[in-house]
């Protein structure tokens, strides 16, 4: 199918992108084939009039968990027990897989055309990836890690990560993941905000350096990159010293950390969204304890300072929003761009570039997607207003196109309560 997208204003996704009017985007099946001037012969094309809207690359979310919808719970939940129950029989497995697929679809309806999953239930993420690629499922392109590798008492152990007691068990899980044809490997090196037992100890080191090195060495031998959950300065150093390729979340850096990033050639995937509710919400709203709020502020400040320091020192920065955590819904990745602009001080232009072409490059798919250029996948979105002027334009989409599949007037079901709580932090 040949399509011509007319009467739109192009934003190509490059770092210096500027609005380009009077252009027509031509696609054939799942590929962009040309960008031409108005007035060319469009015989043989289905013409889609964009009515003056802004066409930019589809967003790319590099830190996704498809096992949750972001709805905050009234009380703490035993996620490991819930996953054991889900996997206990075929019926509950089937229901859970359908939910995961529905959450992937919500990402797409929210304008995200590529996701990178970094911890999920069993092999659900690679199955979802393959179903989407085969056209059996409406979802973004998926780069999947399946279950992460954690340790007993470690972050997400037993839910979206497997608890490895020793190096042999960690390597056995890596072999299992490789058999599932994952795209990357995920380690849980430190704890998180809610894992801390005391004030001032978020991001406590959980995984021994020897295990990190053993998994990284074997993963690299097999051709995989390794992403690692790290939320403390100590954890970041252990990760980088032992071969990790991307730091997920991040923490405040010193000169030694900067040197390690550069020597390793690693990048940091900034995630401002998950700590924000714990750090900034009133505890009467979040339900967080004084300890959790205190630790949330440490992590929030660490993530923001990590991104700022990285940008100032030429360390690559990616964006993800840790969707699936409380208050982070599958349709609102656009908020992460707003937070990146607000708290890290980047321009709207740079935020959009980071969430499109830069993310694609850092995820290893920059030759396939991330910018509007011939030969790349037909992955783009259309907004009524200019996101370079206000990133909130990305909230309401006129059109989503993923691998050539057109979704007009996408309208994801929204959690109005969560949206209302988060909206003040966009100002």
PLM features: residue spans?
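Histidine/acidic-residue-rich, glycine-tolerant segments that coordinate divalent metal ions
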Residues: 115-238, 246
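Active-site core of metal-dependent hydrolases
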Residues: 191-304, 318-325, 345-346, 360-363
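N-terminal small/glycine-rich loop or linker at the start of catalytic domains
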Residues: 63-85, 143-159, 212-213, 281-283
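Metal-associated gating/positioning segment near the N- to mid-region
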Residues: 54-131
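Active-site microenvironment of metallo-dependent hydrolases
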Residues: 1-23, 28-29, 36-38, 86-88, ...
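Active-site metal-binding motif and surrounding structural segment of the metallo-beta-lactamase
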Residues: 38-56, 91
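His/Asp/Glu-enriched, well-ordered alpha-helical/loop segment
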Residues: 221, 225, 291, 301-386
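Divalent metal-coordination and catalytic microenvironments
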Residues: 8, 25, 30, 52, ...
């Amino acid at each position: 199918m040949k399509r011509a997208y007319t009467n739109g204003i192009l934003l190509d996704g490059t770092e210096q992108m500027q609005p380009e009017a009077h252009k027509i985007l031509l696609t054939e099946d799942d590929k962009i084939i040309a960008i031409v001037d108005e007035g060319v012969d469009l015989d043989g094309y289905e013409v889609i009039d964009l009515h003056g809207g802004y066409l930019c690359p589809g967003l790319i979310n590099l830190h996704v968990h498809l096992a949750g919808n972001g709805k905050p719970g009234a009380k703490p939940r035993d996620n490991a027990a819930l996953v054991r129950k889900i996997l206990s029989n075929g019926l509950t497995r089937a229901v859970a897989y359908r939910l995961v697929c529905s959450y992937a679809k919500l990402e797409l309806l929210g304008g995200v055309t590529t996701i990178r999953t970094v911890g999920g239930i069993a092999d659900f993420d690679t199955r979802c990836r393959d179903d989407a690629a085969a056209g059996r499922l409406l979802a973004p392109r998926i780069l999947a890690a399946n279950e992460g590798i954690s340790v007993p008492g470690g972050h997400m152990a037993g839910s979206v990560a497997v608890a490895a007691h020793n190096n042999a068990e960690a390597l056995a899980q890596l072999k299992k993941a490789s058999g599932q044809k994952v795209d990357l490997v995920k380690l849980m090196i430190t704890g998180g905000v809610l894992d801390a037992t005391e004030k001032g100890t978020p991001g406590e080191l959980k995984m021994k350096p020897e295990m990190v090195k053993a998994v990284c060495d074997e993963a690299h031998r097999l051709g995989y990159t390794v992403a690692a959950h790290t939320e403390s300065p100590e954890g970041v150093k252990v990760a980088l010293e032992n071969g990790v390729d991307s730091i997920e979340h991040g923490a405040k850096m010193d000169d030694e950390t900067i040197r390690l990033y550069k020597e390793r050639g690693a990048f940091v995937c900034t995630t401002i969204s998950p700590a924000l509710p714990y750090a900034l919400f009133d505890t009467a709203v979040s339900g967080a304890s004084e300890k959790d709020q205190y630790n949330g502020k440490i992590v929030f400040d660490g993530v923001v300072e990590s991104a700022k320091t990285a940008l100032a020192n030429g360390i690559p920065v990616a964006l993800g929003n840790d969707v699936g955590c409380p208050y982070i819904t599958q349709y609102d990745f656009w908020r992460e761009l707003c937070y990146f602009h607000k708290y890290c001080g980047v321009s709207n232009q740079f935020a959009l570039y980071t969430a499109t072409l830069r993310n694609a490059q850092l995820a290893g798919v920059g030759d396939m997607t991330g910018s509007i250029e011939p030969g790349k996948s037909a992955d783009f979105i259309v907004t009524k207003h200019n996101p370079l002027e206000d990133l909130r334009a990305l909230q309401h989409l006129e059109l989503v196109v993923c691998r050539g599949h057109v979704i007009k007037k996408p309208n994801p079901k929204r959690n109005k309560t969560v949206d209302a709580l988060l909206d003040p932090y966009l100002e």
